[in-house]
């Protein structure tokens, strides 16, 4: 990617986005619903490892349960924070997330969504996640750790070009 920090500015994720942790209504079984008007309940099992976007959920929670969780909207990122930590996904749907997710939002002023996705997946960011998570009993990330991760922030024009190229490669199976 754009790895030259001398040529492109480096910023912490906290400088360009808001980060918070998901929350779970407890006990969750009291808030699950089959009502079509329920709120999407986004879980790791709804997403395959190769997915970029979250487009569906298997379960929904009640509106009361949503008040005790974290609401997310299309374009927000969710980042797994334990076990297979550091995997980013772009939301294509509205819903709520539990405390196994970190939410990254309000980044659009500084970052192209697709560029940001590939940057979060890049070795230079993943190695920071790994270093931060090592040493804990169960390897995991939290909001304070992720806030301090540094990313390269080239001009939005270069980010857009990168995103266009990545979409082209993905469309034709080059990625």
Where are these regions (language model features)?
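A short beta-sheet element
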Residues: 43-44, 56-121
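Glycine-centered loop/turn positions within well-structured domains
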Residues: 23, 85-86, 127
